[in-house]
């Protein structure tokens, strides 16, 4: 896969493309895309018997403060094949910190042209409360049994915060 050939999206930051690395509900394995080789690599086996609460991946041509492309959790119920690209609408951000520093997760839903299921979801606060609790619980505990690793959940950011975060990540990648 030539990641350079995949666009950020047709109208960033309102919609962005996400390259999926880990499917919702899959085995507790963390995959990461080798950005230069375009190959999906097994990063690690999760020590906790937990599954991702959404399809997880990154936005190409972005750079977060940790030096990686920005992470995205796509809130939908159908597992996507790792390596596929899905167009999404960002609705919020879960602000976290881990043993490596600040680590934000964009929360998004599939774009309306893919499914109408999420067309009335515009902000993370439109999601069911239990979904938000499950997302926070997963990220707070998925590294629990890994030696030397920890995660602290901070605040949630709204749709505007997510858009601002994406714009900054695009600019950071351009300046690299």
Curated annotation (Swiss-Prot):
Keyword annotations from UniProtKB, A to Z: Cytoplasm, Hydrolase, Magnesium, Metal-binding
Molecular function in Gene Ontology: inorganic diphosphate phosphatase activity; magnesium ion binding
Record's keyword annotation contains Manganese: no
Main location: cytoplasm
Top-level taxon: Bacteria
Binding of Mg(2+) 1, residues: 66, 71, 103
Cofactor: Mg(2+)
EC numbers for this chain: 3.6.1.1
PROSITE patterns in UniProt: PPASE
Record-linked InterPro entries: Pyrophosphatase, Pyrophosphatase_sf
Catalytic activity: diphosphate + H2O = 2 phosphate + H(+)
Binding site for Mg(2+) 2: 71
Enzyme class: hydrolase
Residues binding substrate, per UniProt: 30, 44, 56, 142
GO biological process terms held by the UniProt record: phosphate-containing compound metabolic process
Subcellular location: Cytoplasm
A cellular component term, taken from the record's GO annotations: cytoplasm
Record-stated family: Belongs to the PPase family.
Protein task: Catalyzes the hydrolysis of inorganic pyrophosphate (PPi) forming two phosphate ions.
Subunit structure as annotated in this protein's UniProt entry: Homohexamer.
Listed name of the protein: Inorganic pyrophosphatase
Phylogenetic placement of the source organism: Bacteria, Pseudomonadati, Pseudomonadota, Alphaproteobacteria, Hyphomicrobiales
GN (gene name): ppa
């Amino acid at each position: 896969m030539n990641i350079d050939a995949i666009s950020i999206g047709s109208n960033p930051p309102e919609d962005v493309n996400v390259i999926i690395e880990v499917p919702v509900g899959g085995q507790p394995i963390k995959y990461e895309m080798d950005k230069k080789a375009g190959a999906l690599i097994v990063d690690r086996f999760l020590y906790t018997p937990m599954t991702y609460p959404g399809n997880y991946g990154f936005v190409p041509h972005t750079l977060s403060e940790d030096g990686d492309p920005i992470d995205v959790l796509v809130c939908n119920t159908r597992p996507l094949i790792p390596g596929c690209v899905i167009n999404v609408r960002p609705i919020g951000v879960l602000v976290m910190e881990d043993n490596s520093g600040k680590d934000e997760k964009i929360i998004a839903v599939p774009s309306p042209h893919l499914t109408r299921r999420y067309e009335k979801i515009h902000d993370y606060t439109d999601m069911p409360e239990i979904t938000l609790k499950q997302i926070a619980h997963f990220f707070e505990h998925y590294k629990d049994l890994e030696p030397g690793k920890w995660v602290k959940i901070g605040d949630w950011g709204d749709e505007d915060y997510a858009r601002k975060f994406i714009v900054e990540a695009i600019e950071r990648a351009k300046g690299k």
